[in-house]
Design a protein with these regions (language model features):
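Single-residue signature of alpha-solenoid repeat helices
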Residues: 4, 36-37, 71, 109, ...
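Hydrophobic/aromatic packing residues within the alpha-helices of TPR/SEL1-like helical repeat arrays
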Residues: 5-8, 40-41, 68, 75, ...
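Structural marker of alpha-solenoid helical repeat scaffolds
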Residues: 10-13, 46-47, 81-85, 119, ...
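Alpha-solenoid helical repeat scaffolds
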Residues: 17-23, 53-57, 87-95, 125-129, ...
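Residue-level recognition of tetratricopeptide repeat
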Residues: 25-26, 60, 98, 132-133, ...
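TPR-repeat structural position
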Residues: 33-34, 68, 106, 141, ...
């Protein structure tokens, strides 16, 4: 596989970047994520005019490596460059909002996530993420529960959404409902430490 990847030269940004991404993934699997990130960043810096696809990839690599400020920088660059009605905007807002939330910039996080929901009100994952963030902050609990109930109606077999709604009921002392949902979450994903905490 590596020999094939080497054939993608730097002259063609698309194929060059495809090779770089694949090699970074191989490094992450065979060695470690830090080395993988260092490699892809070094290669990214060699590209004079990265397009939005490349910016999106590097932002995701930073986000997955918990380098949230860097991720925000590149998500913002894409958001600023695309049409306001672009179909990819809600996903970018979700990713940037999640990055803001991770570093405690909750006002900016809420703004992005609510904007994403304004564009795509039936996105179960954005509903779940924002609602869970509010639960953790003890903020707008009733609204958070309503959002989670909507998310559950859209994705009734998702263990993370089921776990979130169970946690919401637990926080509001509705222990019977909480037990039902939390048990269901564990059954759907018994080996996940997040669900089993």
């Amino acid at each position: 596989a590596k020999k094939t990847l080497k054939n993608f030269k730097k002259g063609n940004n698309f194929y060059y970047w495809y090779r770089v991404k694949k090699e970074a993934q191989i490094i992450a699997k065979q060695r470690n994520k830090k080395e993988s990130l260092n490699y892809i960043v070094a290669e990214f810096d060699k590209i004079e005019k990265p397009n939005n696809k490349i910016l999106f990839d590097i932002a995701n690599f930073y986000k997955n490596s918990k380098k949230y400020e860097k991720a925000i920088k590149y998500y913002t660059a894409i958001i600023d460059s695309i049409d306001k009605n672009s179909e990819i905007k809600p996903d970018l807002l979700y990713r940037r909002g999640g990055s803001y939330e991770r570093i405690g910039l909750y006002k900016k996080a809420d703004k992005d996530l609510l904007y994403a929901l304004k564009i795509s009100p039936d996105d179960a994952y954005v509903l779940n993420y924002l609602a869970y963030s509010w639960l953790e902050r003890n903020y707008k609990i009733n609204e958070a529960i309503t959002m989670l109930e909507t998310a559950y109606s859209l994705k009734s077999n998702d263990p993370y959404i089921i776990d979130s709604i169970g946690w919401a009921y637990y926080l509001t002392d509705d222990y019977l409902k909480a037990e039902k949902f939390l048990k269901s979450a564990v059954e759907l994903m018994p080996d996940d430490p997040i669900v089993n905490d």
